[in-house]
């Protein structure tokens, strides 16, 4: 299973084009593969992301109205009892396992760099005037350095992929509480995350994807 979430930037049209290109091209190319190995997937994804970065840059150069377009990307390749995570930008991946909610990715953003340098706190970063400045994305620079992480997936573990529209509106404890609601199906939990983020003032596009390693039906994701 390959799940991808993108958040376009560079104007309404440009952002939509860049994010659609990334999801469509990677999804199509993945459908023609048959590997189930993290090392092969890592190499394949690295090549694909660099190729897509070049394609978006060339498309933006060809069409003036798309100049400056780009997109964040976060993806998860789930196989057997493992998952390979890759990302560029501030769209995030989380895991929910045995009651623990863990952020798997580190934002490629200016404010996160300031937090790491100790110049601002995580709380200050949430409201910083430059919080939307991204340091890595597809289609922004001729070179990219995607980050990869491999995790184990136990029975009933959930991986959450999301744009910053969700995390700007809901805190980690609020997200965790919804994911922990076993009475809700996976789709219902996904819909509730989005509706709660909108209810609490979500002014940005909100995209959420959940991958569930369901214990009794491992293919139900």
Language-model-derived ranges and their functions:
Residues 1-221:
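PP2C/PPM-type serine/threonine phosphatase catalytic domain
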């Amino acid at each position: 299973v390959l799940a991808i979430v993108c958040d376009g930037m560079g104007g309404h049209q440009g952002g939509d084009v860049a994010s659609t290109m990334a999801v469509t091209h990677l999804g199509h190319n993945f459908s023609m593969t048959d590997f189930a190995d993290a090392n092969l997937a890592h190499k394949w994804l690295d090549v694909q992301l660099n190729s897509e970065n070049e394609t978006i840059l060339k498309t933006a150069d060809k069409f003036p109205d798309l100049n400056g377009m780009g997109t964040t990307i976060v993806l998860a390749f789930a196989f057997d009892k493992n998952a390979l995570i890759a990302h560029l930008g501030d769209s995030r991946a989380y895991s929910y396992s045995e009651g623990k909610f863990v952020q798997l990715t580190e934002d490629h953003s200016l404010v996160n760099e300031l937090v790491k340098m100790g110049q601002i706190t995580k709380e200050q970063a949430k409201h910083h005037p430059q919080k939307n400045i991204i340091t890595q994305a597809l289609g922004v620079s001729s070179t990219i350095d995607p980050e990869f992480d491999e995790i184990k997936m136990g029975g009933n573990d959930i991986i959450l992929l999301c744009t910053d529209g969700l995390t700007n509106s809901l805190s980690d404890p609020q997200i965790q509480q919804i994911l922990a609601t076993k009475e809700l199906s996976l789709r219902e939990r996904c819909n509730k995350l989005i509706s709660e983020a909108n209810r609490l003032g979500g002014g940005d596009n909100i995209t959420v994807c959940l991958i569930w390693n369901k214990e009794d039906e491992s293919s139900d994701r």
